[in-house]
UniProtKB/Swiss-Prot annotation:
It is found in: Virion membrane; Host cell membrane. Interacts with host TNFRSF1A, RIPK1 and IRAK1; these interactions interfere with host NF-kappa-B activation at the level of receptor complexes. Interacts with host protein UBQLN4. It comes from Mumps virus (strain RW) (MuV). The lineage of its organism: Viruses, Riboviria, Orthornavirae, Negarnaviricota, Haploviricotina. Keywords: Host cell membrane, Host membrane, Host-virus interaction, Inhibition of host NF-kappa-B by virus, Membrane, Transmembrane, Transmembrane helix, Virion. The keyword Membrane applies. Coiled coil: none annotated. This is Small hydrophobic protein. It is a single-pass membrane protein. One of its GO terms (biological process) is symbiont-mediated suppression of host NF-kappaB cascade.
Amino acid sequence: MPAIQPPLYLTFLLLILLYRIITLYVWIILTITYKTSVRHAALHQRSFFRWSFDHSL
């Protein structure tokens, strides 16, 4: 049994590491896309409001 334990432990550690890397990667992508989308939306909204305001006057 002790001979089987180290590889299982290593694979378990590897899985945890892989899971952490994937979650971190996904989190980074989501935050980047969220920030850029929010920035773009704010810019578009601002320009649209300015355009409508200028044309209303």
